Amino acid sequence: MRVRYEDEAIVVVDKPFGLPSQAPRGGGANLFDQVRAIWPKAALLHRLDTVASGLVLFAIDPRVNAALTEAFRSHAVHRTYRAVVVGTGLGAEVWDVEVQGKAARTQVESLGTGRGCTAVRLLPHTGRKHQLRIHAAMAGFPMCGDRRYGGEAARRWPRLALHASRLGFVHPVSAEPTTVESPLPDDLVELWQSVMGS
């Protein structure tokens, strides 16, 4: 876990691949417990899939919990992800397909192609469980390493190529626009560079 932003009210940390956001059934290591060990009043406001990596925002002052919970509920927290998907020919588009019977919308931007894959930026407008992975698979561009939704073509990569790279929100105390960014982790850099050609 690496801290990307911290003040008296909130903390934003990088969740590594393979670590659950909160305790799984039966217990075990998880991000929430690690954060609570340092900030005992921390509140988990959203989650990332265990097999994804990237930024997670916590309230560490209970007085801002309600404001941040409402910001997530009303989609006022802007999340940006970077991913690598199987296939080429993807441009700038919007995936607007229900997920588990609920409206779900994801904005997609192609950043480069190579080796039969495409590097993309994803901006979810809703926050359904596994939304980005399901949308990518339904569009015919499963995420590299997605063993649940990706099929055989996606399984040859050792991890899911999905990273929560940016959070933008209005700070609950200062009311200032706040942006926190996270670089790709080392285990995704090589794949990303092979697709982007750099």
Where are the predicted features?
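RNA pseudouridine synthases
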Residues: M1-S198
